[in-house]
């Protein structure tokens, strides 16, 4: 019979009890996990894409309406740009804390955990169920899921600018392209504002302010815009440095120019005070609206960006919406 005494073990090179080990095991105290579980209870039901179009895998959608459509139509709540997905493929139905899934007579069916569900028949979802829509695979996470809460934080970090909290450039450009395509299909207006901070380099170069002062201005500017100007359907992103973009879906050039002027005036009137020093801040704005001649988001952005530089050449602290 083999016993423990038949084995020889080398003693560990360094024990947890050695005072100068430098990497002692930390004894866990407190209720960190309890706090995480308590926070997760506030997390609504979600679906996350496991397999699908590039750029969308890992994306999380919150189920925050009583009914949500998954489909290839730009009007879908969960838009999936994949030819295997019908325009209106699947419906998610939420009642209280229970979520049901229903196939909308799609061409390629809706499959839950390897079983195709009958059309127009709601099927109750359980936590971690997998939903296949055409060739696209989602995972359902029920309310209070720790995994969904963690994924939500990861997604937010990947989409947001770490300094200001505005959406980052990658997310901005993706949203712009999606919004442009959607506006063309639905035949609705779409405008954008491109703006940057006037003489921002002087703020960074000021010995009393330096880069911390510049960072403060960027954060305060975004906070001011988000709390005073951004509507629920608007989208604010940081393009880079001190340059930002607002996407105004459904706004024509006149409406966008008015919003641009309100934006300019709000920033001019706002008091930016850093460590007791008042910093005068103004912005220059370029405005553009999608025209029938434009075929890409990049064309729309280029027009607004050109008008931004017209505002700067013409004296700064102004809005340019034509030319």
Task: Walk through the language-model features, giving the residues of each.
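Active-site-proximal alpha-helical element of nucleotidyl cyclase-like catalytic domains
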Residues: 213-233, 243
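Conserved nucleotide-binding and Mg2+-coordinating catalytic segments in signaling enzymes
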Residues: 154-174, 195-211, 219
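Intrinsically disordered, low-complexity acidic Ser/Thr-rich regulatory segments
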Residues: 1-81
């Amino acid at each position: 019979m083999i016993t423990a005494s038949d084995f020889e073990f080398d003693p560990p090179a360094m024990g947890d009890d050695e005072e100068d080990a430098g990497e002692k095991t930390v004894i866990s105290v407190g209720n960190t996990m309890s706090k995480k579980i308590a926070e997760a209870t506030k997390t609504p039901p979600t679906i996350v894409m496991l397999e699908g179009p590039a750029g969308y895998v890992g994306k999380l959608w919150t189920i925050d309406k009583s009914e949500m459509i998954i489909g290839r139509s730009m009007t879908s709540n969960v838009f999936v740009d994949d030819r295997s997905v019908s325009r209106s493929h699947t419906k998610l139905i939420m009642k209280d804390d229970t979520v049901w899934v229903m196939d909308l007579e799609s061409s390629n069916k809706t499959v839950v955990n390897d079983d195709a569900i009958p059309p127009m028949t709601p099927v109750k979802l359980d936590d971690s169920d997998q939903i296949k829509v055409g060739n696209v695979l989602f995972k359902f996470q029920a309310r209070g899921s720790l995994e969904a809460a963690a994924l939500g934080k990861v997604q937010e970090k990947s989409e947001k600018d770490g300094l200001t909290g505005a959406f980052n450039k990658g997310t901005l450009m993706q949203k712009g392209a999606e919004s442009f395509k959607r506006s063309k299909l639905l035949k609705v207006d779409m405008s954008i504002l491109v703006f940057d901070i006037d003489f921002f380099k002087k703020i960074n170069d000021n010995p009393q302010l330096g880069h911390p002062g510049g960072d403060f201005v960027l954060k305060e500017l975004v906070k001011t815009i988000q709390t005073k100007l951004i509507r629920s359907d608007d989208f604010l992103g940081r393009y880079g440095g001190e340059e930002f973009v607002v996407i105004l879906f459904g706004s024509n050039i006149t409406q966008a120019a008015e919003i641009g002027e309100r934006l300019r005036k709000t920033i001019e009137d706002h008091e930016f005070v850093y460590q007791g020093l008042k910093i005068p801040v103004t912005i220059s704005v370029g405005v553009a609206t999608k025209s029938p001649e434009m075929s890409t988001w990049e064309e729309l952005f280029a027009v607004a960006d050109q008008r931004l530089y017209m505002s700067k050449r013409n004296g700064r602290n102004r809005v340019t919406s034509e030319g």
